[in-house]
């Protein structure tokens, strides 16, 4: 059966709102047609540069304009990252995703160091993913040459609700970055967050945006908002587990071949709830004691859960072969001293402005 790239919001809403047991059955059936239901990818998310981001994302404690008591750190060294990757591999992870709190990639020493990090992790026979903000086609090509397996750039929500969350960067800017990644052999990881105050129609809208990409993203992380004090969304109520399961199941039906990743918010989910998500089609998790800045179950807890459920960690490069890594001196693509161009909507989001004012008061 050919993948469908013309899903409408109405079609996706109809799936999302099916009777719960029917939705689970449909999703589980499709999941088994495309994936081993007993195999789950384990990925470790590593914050290589924390805090100080100039964006105003309403959910994010790394935004410099909000007061969140976050302890920032400069870019980690290549050796520090390699040591963390070795630790992750020993714990059962097959992928390392490096996150830097940047609006965009800038050519120069720091990006050169990130490229070396990619090379060093690739040599450990692990899948390497990065989430570094916006990037140009040339920068994407250089990451691909270094041996990058995946690039993460989330859409966050529907295009309509996105405007209630972020004013410093447009939705199309995110799609443009995904487009630049698609011009290389790097796979795309892109998903979003539920629980930010969006409607079911917004959740469907996000899945429309993702599923109509051709090809569809190889990975789609589904995050449940973790409210952080000091951010504009600090008072949002936790997402009910039933909504998370519905979102996972709908994503699986709409994008059958994609790896659906249970991401932020797992500390709020029982093992029973997570098991239902796996049954509904989730086949990837982020492991480690925190995801960038938010709490996450300990790896040993996850391995215990896997044992209980009869799940096996996915081996590296099961979905796609290991990328070749080219040494810096042999690189076909050189620094052009460029940075991405992006729109600056700069419309007013009241709760973001209020949190920003509160931060000034506390300072």
Swiss-Prot record:
Which cofactors does this gene product need? [4Fe-4S] cluster; [2Fe-2S] cluster
Q: Which residues bind [4Fe-4S] cluster?
A: 53, 57, 60
Which pathway, per its entry? Cofactor biosynthesis; biotin biosynthesis; biotin from 7,8-diaminononanoate: step 2/2
Instruction: State how the cofactor is bound.
Output: Binds 1 [4Fe-4S] cluster. The cluster is coordinated with 3 cysteines and an exchangeable S-adenosyl-L-methionine.
Q: Name one GO molecular function term.
A: 2 iron, 2 sulfur cluster binding
The alphabetized UniProt keywords are: 2Fe-2S, 4Fe-4S, Biotin biosynthesis, Iron, Iron-sulfur, Metal-binding, S-adenosyl-L-methionine, Transferase
Q: Name one GO biological process term.
A: biotin biosynthetic process
Write down the top EC class of this protein.
transferase
Composition bias, Basic and acidic residues: 316-353
Q: Which reaction does it catalyse?
A: (4R,5S)-dethiobiotin + (sulfur carrier)-SH + 2 reduced [2Fe-2S]-[ferredoxin] + 2 S-adenosyl-L-methionine = (sulfur carrier)-H + biotin + 2 5'-deoxyadenosine + 2 L-methionine + 2 oxidized [2Fe-2S]-[ferredoxin]
Q: Which residues form the Radical SAM core domain?
A: 38-266
Any idea of its EC number?
2.8.1.6
Q: Where does the chain bind [2Fe-2S] cluster?
A: 97, 129, 189, 261
**What is its quaternary makeup?**
Homodimer.
PANTHER family to which the protein is assigned, alphabetical: BIOTIN SYNTHASE (PTHR22976), BIOTIN SYNTHASE, MITOCHONDRIAL (PTHR22976:SF2)
- Homology family: Belongs to the radical SAM superfamily. Biotin synthase family.
| Job description of the protein | Catalyzes the conversion of dethiobiotin (DTB) to biotin by the insertion of a sulfur atom into dethiobiotin via a radical-based mechanism.
- What name appears for this protein in its UniProt entry? Biotin synthase
Name of the coding gene: bioB
